[in-house]
Amino acid sequence: MVQERIDLKNLFVEIRRKGSTSQVSRDLDVSMGNISDWKNGRSVPNAVSLVKLADYFGCSVDYLLGRTEHRDMI
């Protein structure tokens, strides 16, 4: 079944775990505006950004999208 709404809660858990939005923004060369838009539901990360984020946090894209609660990549 296709999920209608993307839940990025795990993305923001990971950002808090790293310390700050500004640090993640600098490290990944993603604008603070983009991260703010993701947080406020105005947009979602594109596929390239999702892969970058998953690699950065050491987790799966499915975890970031809220499709699984298992953080570890398989």
Model-predicted segments: where are they?
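DNA major-groove recognition helix of helix-turn-helix
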Residues: K39, F57, L65-T68
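DNA major-groove recognition helix of helix-turn-helix/homeodomain DNA-binding modules
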Residues: V48-Y63
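Short coil turns linking two alpha-helices in DNA-binding domains
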Residues: S31-G33, N46, S60
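A short, Lys/Arg-rich alpha-helix, primarily the initiator
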Residues: M1-G19, Q23
